[in-house]
Amino acid sequence: MKRIGITCYPTLGGSGVIATELGKMLAEQGHEIHFITSSMPFRLDRIYPNIYYHEVEISNYPVFQYPPYDLALAAKMAEVVDREHIEILHVHYAMPHAISAILARDLADHPVKVVTTLHGTDITVLGFDPTFKKMISHGIEQSDAVTAVSNSLVKQTKEKLGVKKDISVIYNFVNEQEYYKRNLNHIKKQYNIKSDEKVVIHISNFRKVKRVEDVIHTFSKIQSKIKAKLLLVGDGPETSTAFQLVKKLGLEQYVLFLGKQKNISELLSISDLKLLLSEQESFGVVLLEAMTCKVPCIGTRVGGIPEVVEHGKTGYLVELGDITQAAAYGIELLTNEEKWQAFSDDALVFAKTHFHSEHILKQYNELYDDVLSR
């Protein structure tokens, strides 16, 4: 049994989901898990006798222009490490979590190892900022072990930051007990989706990098050839722009804006095709969620997406911005039942073979053992 502290962003988002699900699986193996976060992780949806939550409280002193979250986090980490005899602090994101964990390791009396998992934004966005570049590099170099969610992210990290640290690739995963294909025709009826209409789905945080407009233009081309509906799941800065584009293209009756949803696996179960046409993705966990629900995917040939989608077998890859090719592939799949079924079956097999949670959990356990043996 290991005592492991986990820090992540507790809100909706791929990294928070992965961190929380990992903690739950480790707890089910008998490990003692301590979440040290600013609020309760939203996926921590039931009581576990060996999972504990420690809230990071931020004091608002007038002398500080902004509340010092990273320092408050480090102090809370050190406190929990000493009181609970934490052996490993596993932090998700180098900035600021790895920096806080390294400071906590220095502050704590009890010895603790720091494992950092890179998810992407800290490298692909903050890594460009000269203000943070050296700080992120320090967080990576001073960690006892570092993992990344794709080979693409490892390459980007080495190239952008010039770090020498060995970075292991441990892919993302999904909870197979939650994500699986089921017959939910009643949900189609609730959304007024007819039995002869195909369902295309896009799930994201609607930031500019997700290129939701490309998704809508691609769907417009698909819908001009076959009966289809588009489910837009999520919310963010580009939602209003997306809504205006749908109106401009006259697609209001074919596009459903569903906002943030918790029942993602149910929505995927009624879907026939997943679109993710981002300009940058370190992994694209929504693709894996779709594949586990037997939904073929079309994604851009960027970042870690080619490591998740097997072109011509579980879905298709297109160049960034090539909505014409994306639509052509979509029409090809949605009008060829035999091909769609083959892609659907292969998507599930590929997901189970390469990203099964048991395999990923084994990799993390081996990493923890290695770190503690040093």
Question: What residue spans do the PLM features occupy?
Answer:
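A short helix/loop element that forms part of the nucleotide-sugar donor recognition site in Leloir-type
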Residues: 180-193
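Carbohydrate-associated surface elements
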Residues: 152, 173
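Short hydrophobic beta-strand element within catalytic cores of glycosyltransferases
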Residues: 296-299, 309
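Conserved donor-binding/catalytic core segment of Leloir-type glycosyltransferases
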Residues: 194-210, 216-219
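Aromatic "clamp/platform" in nucleotide-sugar-dependent glycosyltransferases that forms part
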Residues: 260, 279
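Conserved acidic donor-binding segment of nucleotide-sugar-dependent glycosyltransferases
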Residues: 311-312, 316-323, 332-337
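Nucleotide-activated donor-binding/catalytic signature segment of Leloir-type glycosyltransferases, i.e.
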Residues: 243-259
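N-terminal strand-loop element at the rim of the active site
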Residues: 6-13, 24-69
